[in-house]
């Protein structure tokens, strides 16, 4: 199910307004996606945080990308719409950086579909994976 562009823009604007008090300044680079710990956002960008609390700013044009739409949809399913605070994606920063590189390469349709399927099936949050790691460690200690 695809979210239409108007609805997605409206959702992103709503999330941005709710997160306005928690924003940090971004140092822009040529890659069009930025991470920083300062306090404001450049005009034409929206901000998300990863599960490991790393901040990313994307140009608004990324909202039309189906991968970014899926990430926002997963965030809404896992955390709901934030009433206070920023949009948080249920993935760590390493995974998000990898996705950004794939988006910037403008992959073909088949690759994008495969990536969307893998993202959808990997809805387990960082907390879930940490829990699994903890259980694995406990099992090793028992053996």
Swiss-Prot record:
Membrane topology: Peripheral membrane protein
Protein name: Auxin-responsive protein SAUR67
Location(s) in or outside the cell: Cell membrane
UniProt family annotation: Belongs to the ARG7 family.
InterPro entries, per database record: SAUR_fam
Record lineage: Eukaryota, Viridiplantae, Streptophyta, Embryophyta, Tracheophyta
Source organism (scientific name): Arabidopsis thaliana (Mouse-ear cress)
GO terms, biological process: auxin-activated signaling pathway
Function: May promote auxin-stimulated organ elongation, such as hypocotyls, stamen filaments and petals.
Keyword flag Membrane: yes
Keyword Kinase recorded: no
GO CC, any one term: plasma membrane
Keywords associated with the record: Auxin signaling pathway, Cell membrane, Developmental protein, Growth regulation, Membrane
């Amino acid at each position: 199910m695809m979210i239409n562009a108007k609805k997605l823009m409206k959702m992103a604007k709503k999330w941005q307004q709710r997160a306005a008090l928690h924003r940090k300044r971004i140092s822009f680079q040529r890659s069009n996606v930025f991470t920083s710990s300062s306090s404001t956002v450049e005009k034409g960008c929206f901000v998300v945080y990863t599960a490991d609390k790393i901040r990313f700013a994307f140009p608004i044009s990324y909202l039309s990308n189906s991968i970014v739409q899926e990430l926002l949809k997963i965030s809404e399913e896992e955390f709901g719409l934030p009433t206070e605070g920023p949009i948080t994606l249920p993935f760590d920063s390493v995974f998000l950086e990898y996705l950004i590189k794939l988006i910037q390469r403008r992959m073909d349709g088949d690759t994008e579909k495969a990536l969307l399927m893998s993202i959808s099936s990997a809805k387990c949050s960082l907390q879930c994976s940490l829990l699994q790691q903890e259980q694995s460690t406990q099992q090793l200690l028992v053996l």
